[in-house]
């Protein structure tokens, strides 16, 4: 059974460990399937905004929406480490509010850890949260909450200066107590160098094969996204299966073949009702 500490040890290059697996989930049925499959960590991502709630970006996602999804996932998860994503502006502006919002995910919704889209502004907050017993997963590279500042969903760390700044931030967050680091949309060689330079595990998404683990959005994996990023891979086609099932249902109702006798109950002790 994975724990925050066992995940942290996966970044120790002196130990032979399997790559860390992480997927997103936002509801109990999905979390149950992911957990039963043996995935190490479940991220209740703010990607729920795009994947489930109909938002164009992750920016509108609220603390209440993440909290509700986190509780549902945690109730359905027996083994995986549940990580709650901290949504846009739920942290960083005020330390007291940041601690309260992060603590809520553990205290009320039974998460095991929180994830912060990270930068220079989250180093001291990471130290504060971990000192209070709230495990923190850092996140560098493409940080979708900064899409307006970045001008789009572009690869990060593509020049020497930005790659070295990313490495410095990775080291700073490790020193502040982060137990793992997500690297998103980062050149594979940069991600490999950062992975070699720090002891906590790196979890890649669009960051090549040499990180300590991988994470993807569940809707991309199962084929339920209208658009997937180029670094993702579709392992199923749930959209096609769902569309076929719904078509069959409509046909069955319209043709009168559903519900059939086996789907109905007759009360033998009830006479005709007038």
Swiss-Prot record:
One GO cellular component term noted in the UniProt record for this chain: cytoplasm
Cofactor: Mg(2+)
UniProt KW keywords: Coenzyme A biosynthesis, Cytoplasm, Magnesium, Metal-binding, Transferase
GO molecular function: 3-methyl-2-oxobutanoate hydroxymethyltransferase activity; magnesium ion binding
Catalytic activity from the UniProt record: 3-methyl-2-oxobutanoate + (6R)-5,10-methylene-5,6,7,8-tetrahydrofolate + H2O = 2-dehydropantoate + (6S)-5,6,7,8-tetrahydrofolate
Binding of 3-methyl-2-oxobutanoate, residues: 46-47, 85, 115
Protein origin, superkingdom: Archaea
Binding site for Mg(2+): 46, 85, 117
GO biological process annotation, one example: coenzyme A biosynthetic process
Gene3D superfamilies: Phosphoenolpyruvate-binding domains
Cofactor note text: Binds 1 Mg(2+) ion per subunit.
Location, primary (coarse class): cytoplasm
Cellular compartment(s): Cytoplasm
Pathway(s) the chain acts in: Cofactor biosynthesis; coenzyme A biosynthesis
Function: Catalyzes the reversible reaction in which hydroxymethyl group from 5,10-methylenetetrahydrofolate is transferred onto alpha-ketoisovalerate to form ketopantoate.
Assembly and interaction partners: Homodecamer; pentamer of dimers.
NCBIfam families: panB, PRK00311.1
HAMAP family assigned to the protein according to its UniProt record, in alphabetical order: PanB
Family note: Belongs to the PanB family.
Annotated protein name in UniProt: 3-methyl-2-oxobutanoate hydroxymethyltransferase
């Amino acid at each position: 059974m994975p724990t925050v500490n066992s995940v942290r040890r996966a970044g120790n290059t002196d130990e032979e460990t399997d790559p860390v697996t992480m997927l997103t989930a936002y509801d109990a049925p999905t979390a149950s399937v992911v957990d039963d499959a043996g995935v190490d960590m479940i991220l209740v991502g703010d990607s729920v905004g795009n994947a489930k709630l109909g938002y164009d970006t992750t920016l509108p996602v609220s603390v209440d929406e993440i909290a509700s999804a986190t509780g549902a996932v945690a109730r359905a998860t027996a083994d995986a480490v549940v990580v709650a994503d901290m949504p846009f502006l739920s942290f960083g502006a005020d330390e007291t509010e940041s601690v309260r919002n992060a603590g809520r995910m553990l205290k009320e919704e039974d998460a095991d850890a929180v994830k912060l889209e990270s930068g220079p502004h989250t180093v001291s907050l990471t130290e504060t949260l971990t000192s209070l017993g709230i495990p923190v997963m850092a996140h560098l590279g493409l940080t979708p909450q900064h899409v307006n500042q970045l001008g789009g969903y572009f690869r990060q760390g593509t020049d020497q200066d930005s790659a070295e700044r990313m490495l410095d931030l990775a080291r700073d967050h490790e020193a502040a107590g982060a137990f793992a680091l997500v690297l998103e949309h980062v050149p594979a060689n940069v991600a490999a160098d950062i992975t070699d330079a720090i002891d906590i595990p790196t979890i890649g998404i669009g960051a090549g094969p040499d990180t300590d683990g991988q994470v993807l959005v569940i809707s991309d994996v199962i084929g339920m996204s209208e658009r997937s990023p180029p670094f993702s891979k579709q392992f199923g086609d749930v959209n096609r299966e769902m569309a076929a099932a719904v078509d069959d249902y409509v046909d069955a109702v319209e043709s009168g073949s559903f519900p059939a006798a086996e789907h109905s109950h007759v009360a033998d002790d009830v006479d005709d009702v007038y």
